Curated annotation (Swiss-Prot):
Protein known as: Phosphatidylserine decarboxylase proenzyme
Needed co-factor(s): pyruvate
Active site: residue positions: 90, 143, 248
HAMAP family linked to this entry: PS_decarb_PSD_B_type1
Amino acid sequence: MRDNLFIYLQYLLPHTLTSRLVSKLADSENKIIKNHLIRLAIKKFNINLVEAKETDISKYKSFNDFFIRELKDDLRPISNDKNVISSPADGVLSQFGTITDNSLIQAKGKLFSLESLIASSSTTSFTKFATIYLSPKDYHRVHMPIDGKLTKMVYIPGKLFSVNKITTSKVDNLFAKNERLICYFDTIIGEIAVIFVGALLVAGIETVWHGKIAPNYYKDIQTWDYNSAKFNIKFNKGDILGWFNFGSTVIILTSGNNVSFKFEENKNNIKIQVNQDLALITE
């Protein structure tokens, strides 16, 4: 009953307006406001500040600045093996596996189509997926899972439902309904996509090459082509791609048939950390 009420209230909420108001509050540099919000978040979400590069909350200029805090150096070691695909984020590996009949698993008993996720019928190259949920207590920066060159970025406006366990199990096609930013890269295994999925209270998605995109800032699908020689935007495995200004979800899509996950399929909700081995590239 409580879960159904939570879902119902989300349908009533003005998603974009709510998230933009949260964004303004989270961007406030008023010391009293931002320090109070940070203390509340640490207590409410049991945030481990010991891992942060900066542990003095007074040094963060805003609540958002705190939420995208950096980790201490070498806290998340990464494999130098080019055949290892690393986790792009701290969080919970909620679902992963093979894309079958153009469908991905959202939650137990719920599927959604790849075509609806990326808003394109050109889906034939993607064969595997992994979905990582970032809770409010997690490190919020997203890193490159494998060496690659940025070729395209697509912004798709949409709803801003919560992406927690309750909502993913109740709302059909959740990740294809929510606002999302899809980043395409050319890699040694072919094309991959790293998808930032927006959510309720997420005050924006930001990339290191483009900057911040506020919730539903664009009313239509927007595409940026980075494939020309004048851009040549390359990332090494482990490089920072961007971040969420609150908890959300990252989905990775990979091409080819030579990617094998390091976890047993049919298992889910696995705690994972950024740079941890996620999958192997096999011969």
